[in-house]
């Protein structure tokens, strides 16, 4: 994010880090847009999105979630990490941690949630889904409803 309250032009031109996330791809383009048609005015949740493209041809979506939705999805992501085994035994949090080339260290992802991981809740067995739901103290049907709504808004 840009620091519009900075005192000098140099400080104002410097971007501040607001989030970090390892994607595993080299992003080479960002554009405003969405993969879905515009919503009707009466829809409950509107999510501003950016599309990105990578050198390998991946198209992805960055969605700016309202605070309550972000907090819910972050809690769900944390619970899912405890109940889902990563590919090759790699933990999701380790895969998404961001390595700083200048600082020479890795930091956990911050201010991002992994939409693919969140959506994978819909593919869990009923037993695992109930365990995740109990972990965040939200009814399984409510989680399904909210994840499906996010899918509809961002795909």
Predicted region positions:
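C-terminal scaffolding/assembly regions of large eukaryotic complex subunits
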Residues: 1-155
């Amino acid at each position: 994010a840009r620091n519009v309250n900075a005192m000098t032009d140099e400080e104002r031109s410097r971007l501040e880090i607001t989030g970090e996330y390892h994607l595993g791809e080299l992003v080479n383009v960002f554009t405003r847009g969405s993969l879905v048609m515009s919503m009707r005015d009466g829809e409950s949740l509107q999510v501003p999105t950016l599309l990105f493209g990578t050198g390998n041809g991946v198209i992805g979506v960055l969605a700016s979630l309202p605070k309550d939705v972000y907090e819910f999805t972050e809690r769900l992501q944390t619970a899912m990490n405890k109940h889902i085994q990563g590919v090759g035994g790699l933990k999701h949090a380790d895969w998404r941690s961001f390595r700083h080339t200048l600082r020479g260290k890795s930091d956990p992802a911050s201010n991002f949630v992994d939409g693919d991981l969140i959506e994978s809740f819909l593919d869990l067995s009923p037993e695992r889904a109930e365990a995740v739901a109990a972990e965040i103290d939200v009814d399984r049907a409510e989680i399904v409803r909210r994840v499906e709504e996010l899918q509809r808004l961002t795909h």
